[in-house]
């Protein structure tokens, strides 16, 4: 469900990658652009946005236009929120304008020329599938928070962010597949949040030097350290112990949501199997590095992808099969 990065790692819900191009790991960004006036997104498969759970070959053809529309909505907002050296106030103003166009799309009014290529398809998707607009609005809340990024005091604060930056995507895709069961929604939230956390913990060596600190301060304090100290001594016992605890948290959350994968029938269920096993495999790779994520980023290789596939194929409702080191 979540695409693989071009650097042989995995794409999960995060604010860390997702644009086409390089292998640096930081959102695969070369230099991303806010959609220009009259911008018309090309009909690509949904394979570049980090918060997007999609493997296009598993997406039913009838749903692909709506999935693309949601993708371009999220990707363009992501571009605005993380537009290089643009002042935060400017990005916030652009996101406010973007939110106005979302409201217009929801009511069938014409969007502004600037993002017409984004909102015309989205308006059609909203109309055709009765997309829950509050979920789209929640994504914008998260992007606005990104422009004010000041870190997170504790796990509850970070999970609150995930509830707006990651969980809405899972719920939108469940909605498109006609899945509205509350239990499935809770499990989807757990999987999406877990994937977001996994991406944070695999990208510590990349994000922190760029001013993006997602480590809850309470977790760092519990190990009598700070993220700045961990960057200076990435292989110190406290640094590794901190990553170990963070990965255990992400794994627990993933296993909480994992039963959704074998429980959901059809293509989306198979997609979810790969999502769950991919996330667990990344955690296993971090463990194989002795939790040295402050020093470097884990990478998946061909054997890892084979293991992900095998474990996805053999998942059972009562056996999520956590991906341990082979």
Regions found by a protein language model. Name each.
Residues 1-10:
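Extreme N-terminal basic, low-complexity initiation segments
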Residues 4, 30-195, 201-326:
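Catalytic cores of Mg2+-dependent Asp-rich isoprenoid enzymes
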Residues 11-14, 21-26, 31-35:
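Short, low-complexity intrinsically disordered segments enriched in A/P/G/S/L with frequent Arg
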